[in-house]
Amino acid sequence: MKDLVKFLKAQSKTSEDFDVIKIGLASPDMIRSWSFGEVKKPETINYRTFKPERDGLFCARIFGPVKDYECLCGKYKRLKHRGVICEKCGVEVTQTKVRRERMGHIELASPVAHIWFLKSLPSRIGLLLDMPLRDIERVLYFESYIVIEPGMTDLEKGQLLTEEQFMDAEDRWADEFDAKMGAEAIQALLRDMDLEHECETLREELQETNSETKRKKITKRLKLLEAFMQSGNKPEWMVMTVLPVLPPDLRPLVPLDGGRFATSDLNDLYRRVINRNNRLKRLLDLVAPDIIVRNEKRMLQESVDALLDNGRRGRAITGSNKRPLKSLADMIKGKQGRFRQNLLGKRVDYSGRSVITVGPYLRLHQCGLPKKMALELFRPFIYAKLESRGFASTIKAAKKMVEREDAIVWDILAEVIREHPILLNRAPTLHRLGIQAFEPILIEGKAMQLHPLVCAAFNADFDGDQMAVHVPLTLEAQLEARALMMSTNNVLSPANGDPIIVPSQDVVLGIYYMTREKVNAKGEGMLLQDPREAEKAYRTGRAELHSRVKIRITEYVKNAEGEFEPQTTLTDTTIGRAILWMIAPKGMPYSLFNQTLGKKAISKLINECYRRLGVKASVMFADQIMYTGFAYAARSGSSVGIDDMVIPEKKYEIISAAEAEVAEIQEQFQSGLVTAGERYNKVIDIWATANERVAKAMMENLSTEEVVNREGNLEKQSSFNSIFMMADSGARGSAAQIRQLAGMRGLMARPDGSIIETPITANFREGLNVLQYFISTHGARKGLADTALKTANSGYLTRRLVDVAQDLVIVEDDCGTHEGIVMTPLIEGGDEKVSLRELVLGRVAAEDILKPGTEEVLFPRNTLLDEKVCDILDENSVDSVKVRSVVTCDTDFGVCAKCYGRDLARGHLINQGEAVGVIAAQSIGEPGTQLTMRTFHIGGAASAAAKESSVQVKNSGSIRLTNVKSVTNNEGKLVVTSRNTELTIIDAFGRTKEHYKVPYGAVLNKGDGEAVTAGETVANWDPHTMPVVSEVAGFVKFVDIVDGLTVTRQTDELTGLSSIVVQDVGERATAGKDLRPAIKVVDAQGNDIFIPGVDVLAQYFLPGKAIVTLDDGAEVQVGEPLARIPQESVGTKDITGGLPRVADLFEARKPKEPAILAEITGIVSFGKETKGKRRLVITPVEGEAYEEMIPKWRQLNVFEGEMVERGDVISDGAETPHDILRLRGVHAVTEYIVNEVQEVYRLQGVKINDKHIEVIVRQMLRKGIITKAYDSEFLEGEQVEVARVKIVNRKREAEGKPPVEFERELLGITKASLATESFISAASFQETTRVLTEAAVAGKRDELRGLKENVIVGRLIPAGTGFAYHQNRIKNRGQANVVEEQEVKFSAADEAEIEAEFNMIAEDPAASLAEMLNMADDAE
C-alpha cells in the first residue's frame, strides 16, 4: 500500500517549480518531440464498438488508453501490468488522464504558413521579408511565382512573376534561376535570410536616413530582426512542416443518447486537414498535373488556417448548422475563452445561493444561514465529526445519517458551524467589500439573513436580492476569512477612509426622532440625576422623549496616564439624547450626542468612535445604534399621509407671475426684439426661478411650525411633519423629491438632454393631466435606458483600470526619495472646495513642515500626517504641504509604503504586500455606476450666469497677484495686460481664502498686497469684448488700415457713432491680403514710442473682427483701450460629463479642439499666413525659433510681441494631457488628471481619495521613449519601462558612463495594459492573438510579477498573505537585487502579549479563535 501511495505521488509530480514562462516559435523537431505518434487517418471512433480507430484522431496507441490501466483489446487489465505495452493493440497500460496531455502530430506533405504570423497586423513574415502582405498572399495562395535564386539572370531576388512572365523567363534562361510558388517559396526565402547581415545594413541605413517615416519603418524591422536573433527563434519556423495535434480529451467526442455524437469543432477542423494532406500525398506520389497539386496545396493551406484561426482569412468554415467552427484561437480569446472563463475565475465547490432578508437582531459579525443550506455546505465536516465521535462506522453510514436527517446530525451541525466563518458575496462584486466573512447562525426557513449595516458595502437591499455563500475549507482560509475579511474588520471604506458601516433609513429616522427637541413638551424643565432616571421618567409617562430637561451626565475623559476618569456635569439636554447616551462607549464626549442627529452626524459619531477607541468599540457601538434606532423608529410612528404634503399658498401667484413674464417675452420675440434662441433661454430661466421660489415657499411652510411655549408666547420650532423629518434626517428622500410632491414638478428634459420649455406646474398631490404625464414619461424612459448602458460601460472601465494597475503592490517600506507633490487647498472663486486637511490626511510629509513665517520645524519629513497632526497644521494655519506620492515613488517594480501613506481601510501606515493597484481600480470603478452617462449641453440659461464681469471678495484680507503685468491708468488704477493673471485673497495667517482668474484688460481697484474688506469689488471688466490696451500715452497712428481694403466703416443707427471694423484675411480683396492692420502709438512729433521695460515698439496688430472707435491721430492715455475684440459668445457647448469624461481622462484621449500651448519660452510673432492657417512663431532669447501653423478660426490669447513661457496657453480649449506632460512635466499632468477626475466625482457627491487616481496615473506613466541611447541595449525611439531604464542607468553610473536619456510617455489605460511587460497579463486582457503573436516572435519571458499572471498559472498571488511566500521564493533563488523582507517590528509589550496568547492556545487548543482575534462575545 505504501508503495502505491508513493507511486501515485510520483505520478502527480509535475513541473511545479518554475520562475519564468517563455513563449516562442516551435521548431518542427520540437513538435515531433512532444508527439507520441503520427495521426494518419481522419477517422475518430468506430461507431459500432465506440472504440477509437487506430492511427486516427483518437487513437489509443498514440494518446493512451480509454479506460484506466486497461489496454484496448482487453489483454492486459489491472494495476499489476502497469507500464506494459500490449503487443496486440500497441496501447500502453496506464491512467486515462494521459489522454489530456499526450500530443500527436501530422507530417504535412507541403509546408504551410502560420496564419498568425502572416495576417496578424503588422504581418511578421511581411516585415521580415520586407514585402507587402498582398504579394506574400499571392505567392502563398498560388497566384504568382516568386524568385528565390536569380542566378545569372536580370531577375531580382524576391521579385514576383505571373504565370506568363515565368514561362517567358524559363524560355530565356532555362534553369539558370529558381522561382517557386506556395509556402515552400516563402520558407526558402526565410531560410536564406542572414539576420546579422540584415541588421548591419539596417543600422547603416538608419544612420543615413533623415525621413521620419523611413526611420520608423527601419526601427520596426530592426527590432523584429534583433528579437529573432536574441530569442533563438528561426524565421523559417513561421512556416510549418509539422502540425501538432491537441490531446483528444481536450477536444472530446461524446456519444449522446440516440446514437448521435457531440463533438468539439476542432475534430472537424483536424479531419479536414488530414483528408487534404492525405490526398495531397497521393497526388504527389502519382505525379499529378501541376494545377491539381497546386489546388490541393492551396486547400491544405486554407484548412490549416481555419484550424488555427478560423475566419481570419476569407470566409470562416462553417459546420453543418451554418455557424462558424470554433478554432484554436477562438478557444483562448474573448470572454468565453480559456483566459477569462477558466483561468482568471472559476466556479467553485462548497457554495450556495439564496434570497436575503433582514436580520435586525444579528450582531455585526453574524449572518443567518438556513439549516438546509448549512447541512449541504458542511457535509464533509459533518461526516468527519460523525465518524470521529463514533456515531457512524464508515463514511457511507455517515452519509445515510445525514440523508435521513437524524436528530444527532443537527447537533453535530451546530458544533461544526461554531466559529467557522463563511463568505457572503453579492454580485456584482464591484469592490473588495462585496465579499465579506460572517459567522453563521442557524435559522429556519430558506432565506439567508443579513445584518442591515453591511448593506451599504454590499449595495444590497431586501427587495429580492440574492447572495452567494462560500465555505473556506482549510484552516488557513478560515484564518484569513476571520482576520481579514470579517465584516467587523471592514468598518472603513478603502475608497475614502470614512466608515462604511453607517446606519441608514429606519435607523437614522429613529435616532433623529429620539434626539429632536419639542417646545413645551410634557415634563419640560425637570431636573434628573442621571440618564437611567430620564429613561424611567419616559417609560412611566412623566416626560416625553423630546422634553428639554437638565440631567447630570457623567463623561469619561482620558488622563495623562491614558486611564479613563469620570467627570460629571449638569447639562441642558433632552430625555431622548440622555437615553441614547446610555449606549455610548466610554471615552466619547457628550457634546457629540447633544444635538439633533441626522445621517451625517451619526456617521461622524461612528468615525470619532473609531479614531478614539478603535475597531471593537465602534463595532459594538454601531450595533447598539442600530438596535436603538429600529426600536425608536417604531415608537415614533412616522408615516406618510397625503395631508403631510402641504402645498404653499404662494404657489399660484408665483406661477401666474411667471406666465405673464413668458407672455411678455413671446411678444418681444414676435416683434423681433429677441432671437428665438434668446427667447428659449429666457423662458427656461423664468421657469427655473419660479420653480426655485415655489420650492422655497414650500420648504419654509413644511419645515417650521409655530407653537406656544411655557411662558405662553409664540415660538418657532422645527416641524414634526413625517415627510420633512425623513428628508431632514437623511433617512429617505430629498428636498427635490418633496418639491415634486408638494411644489411643482418643474422643467423636464428630452431624451437628448435639452429642456422642454413648458414646465409641469402641477405636483403629484394635485395630480398630472395627460399632457403633463406624457412629458414626464419622455424623460423617465431616457433614465432607464441610460442606467442599462451605464452599468456595462462602468464595468468595462473598472476592468480596464484593474488591468492596468493589477501588478502594483507595496514591496518595500521606504524608497528614500525626497520628491513629492505640493498640496494646497482647492479654492474656486470665493469657496474652499477641498480643504488642505482632506488632501494631506493619511499622507507622509516629503520635507520638514515649518511653522508659517518662522524656521521652526513643526513635523520632520517622513511623518505620517494623521488626525492629530492635521489639527496642529490647522491651528498653525499651514497652507501648503509637500507630501510623498505614488507618482514620485522610486521603487522599481511596485511602490513603497511611505510614498503611499495610510491604508485607508485600516487607518495606519499601509502594510507591505497590500495590492494598492487593485484597491485603487476598485475605488474608482465602484462608484462608476452612480455617475451620469450624459453629456451636458451648457448653453443659454447656464452660460448666462457664467459670464462674470467683476471680482467681489467674500473675506477680508490682503490681495496677492500672480503672473501679472499691468499699467497704471490716469485714474491711478491698474489695468491688467497679461494673460493668465490670478488674484488670491490671503488672510492674516497667510492662508489662501479665495482664488480668481482675472482676464486681460481688467481694471483693478486695489494693487498687490493691499488690504480689502469683505464684499468689496476689486476688479471689473467687460465680459463681452476683449480690449487692446495701450501701454503708453501718445497719439494714435493707423498702419495698413485702409477703408474698403482691410477695414469697413459701420455707423450705429441709434447713436450715430461710426466705428472701424477690421476684416478677416479671408474676406479681403487680393490687394489687402498681405496688409497687416495695426495701431501705433506715437509721440506728438510722430516718432515711435517704445514700451518701457522691454524694447518693443508700441504697435498693436489688430485681428479680424476687431472694432476701433478712435480716429487716426486721437490722443490716448496709458491703460486706455485702443480697440475692442468681440468675444464670440460660445453657443451651446457639449461638456462631456460623468462616466465618459472619466474614461476619456484615463484613456488620455486628445480632445477635439485642444488648447494650443507654447512649446518654448520666447517672444510671439506671426509669420506669413497660408490659406486657412496662420503661422505662429516663438523666438527664444537664444536658440532656434519655433513655428506652428494654427487654424484661423482659433481665438488666440496672445498678441504680437508678447512674451510667453513654455506651457502657456496660446489658444483656449481643453488641454491635452500629453502636451501638459511634455511641456510642464509629470507633476502638472498628475495634478491635471487628478483634479479633472475628482471634478466629475465631486459633482455626484462621491468621495474618493486622490491617492487612488495617482496610482492609476503612475501606471499610465510607466513607459518612456528613449531619446539618447549611447551604447546601451536600447534603441532610440524605443518604448521602454521607465523602471528598466533606471536600473540600467544605475549600472551605467557605477561604471562612470553617461545615463540613457528618455522622455516620459503618457499612455491611456488600455494601451498601458497591453504594453505591460507580462505577455500573459496582456493576452488575458484584450487582443489576445496580437499579443501572443508579438510575444512568440520576440521569445518573450514572463517573470510572473503581477497578480494576474500568478492567478493564471495557479499560484498564490504576490500580494497579501502570498507576499511573503513569493519573497521567500525569490530569496531562495538567491537573486542579489531582492527587496529584503522587512521584519515586523514588535515592541516588547506586544511580544509578551502575543506569547501569552500563544501559550494559552497551546495549553487549550480548543480555545476559541474568536478570543484570539478580539471577537469575544462580551459585547452583549
Curated annotation (Swiss-Prot):
Q: Where does Zn(2+) 2 bind?
A: 815, 889, 896, 899
Concerning SMART domains, the annotation shows: RPOLA_N
Which reactions are catalysed by this chain?
RNA(n) + a ribonucleoside 5'-triphosphate = RNA(n+1) + diphosphate
Transmembrane parts of this sequence = none
Give the keywords, sorted.
DNA-directed RNA polymerase, Magnesium, Metal-binding, Nucleotidyltransferase, Transcription, Transferase, Zinc
Please give the cofactor(s) recorded in the UniProt entry for this protein: Mg(2+); Zn(2+)
Task: State any single GO MF term.
Answer: DNA-directed RNA polymerase activity
Q: By its UniProt entry, which Pfam families does this protein fall under? A: RNA_pol_Rpb1_1 (PF04997), RNA_pol_Rpb1_2 (PF00623), RNA_pol_Rpb1_3 (PF04983), RNA_pol_Rpb1_4 (PF05000), RNA_pol_Rpb1_5 (PF04998)
Subunit annotation: The RNAP catalytic core consists of 2 alpha, 1 beta, 1 beta' and 1 omega subunit. When a sigma factor is associated with the core the holoenzyme is formed, which can initiate transcription.
Family the entry assigns: Belongs to the RNA polymerase beta' chain family.
Protein name, entry field: DNA-directed RNA polymerase subunit beta'
Ranked from the top, the taxonomy reads: Bacteria, Pseudomonadati, Pseudomonadota, Gammaproteobacteria, Pasteurellales
